[in-house]
Amino acid sequence: MNLKLLFFANLREQFGFSQKEFTLSKEVRTPEEFLLIMSKQFGGEWIKLFEDKMLYKVAINQDLSSWKDPIFEGDELAIFPPITGG
């Protein structure tokens, strides 16, 4: 399964990239499951992101989504902090 991941704001600096394509050996059903797989495979910052995921927003193909919404082959995931304004 191929997915494109986009990071914004502090996540970009934390992980050292703003976008990256991943090829996974198995199907992933949700953004939450994707983070779980990444945390098991890479540890470190991925574990922290998985544990803190509710502090961040996720979009699937540029549509604001939930961590439990379905994802499919070739989808684009974007993870970013909540935006505030004034």
Where are these regions (language model features)?
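Ubiquitin-like/PB1-type beta-grasp interaction modules and other compact soluble beta-rich domains
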Residues: 1-85
